């Protein structure tokens, strides 16, 4: 037999359930009424129904421009950089099997799918350069779909301009190719002279960098680095062959000039040893070489945890530069960006401007912010790609 208190509690529960049911019915009615009057309620999620339907490739010298098409007449452009078109084209065609019919806004999923589809093919320049071009196009599509620049999809801009080089106030001295290494101080004299002249050219407030291109043996590199200390060099680039962490550590322990590398370290898995061993000061990730926007953003975040800034490497066209600019615009730790104007024979129109001080505005418009003249692009005669064949003074194979 229920007590008076239990009855009161039971009544309270019944009343509560009854009132909840009434409220639910009221909300349903309200939704029906507001749905009729509110245009926003009728808008579907376009991102859930968009599908990849096709692709096209256009060879331009050592680059292949890539177009990915969708069922919503939104397309995206990317660049497969520094691969023979005879390699890039078939690779894109082969990888398209993994993309056909997929939702292009699932960028991370598709990156993982492309990279991990065959475990024996993971990594390496051919795969990562190709994935980079595809990844750029997917971000371009997603930005256009939502009507925003790509950097808006990555947390928004952290800066309103991007410092670039080379400019009259920022100059990188090249190594000039392999040199004999006899152990003589005379071996490095021409290089030291080039750095000194560069400093005089840009002035005290300018920026001087040196690109070693892995050309100098470690003892010679150390000797050279110590000799250029008075000229306040921002960095020595690629002081050793990428991946040889022990050599990087040895050099880092022997010099005061900051060391930079990363253009050929294409993923977070290749970058992490440098950071863990504290043997470089600046990461030079290349968006077009290292898996595209998706991987570059991860490298930047990883480097941030070690307080190592990004100074992106780039020898890409405006398409590849745009992709790199969008990541650069969205990260906190940035130093300076390599930049060479390349519109692929007048077929690419950029959406930023570089001022006389070497500062670039951010890309504008939805997606990557690049207009492509596809008709003109289709008329370009592909030039035959020639494999480089560098040699040391004695005829042996050189890295640069």
Which ranges hold each PLM region?
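N-terminal secretory signal peptides
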Residues: 1-11
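N-terminal export leaders
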Residues: 10-29
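C-terminal segment of N-terminal export signals and the immediately downstream linker at the start
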Residues: 30-62, 66-68, 75
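Metal- or metallocofactor-binding catalytic centers and their adjacent structured scaffolds
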Residues: 71-145
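Conserved, mostly hydrophobic/aromatic
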Residues: 73, 134, 147, 211, ...
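Metal-dependent enolase-superfamily TIM-barrel catalytic cores that perform enediolate-based chemistry
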Residues: 161, 165-254
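Extended hydrophobic packing segments that form well-structured cores
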Residues: 368-400
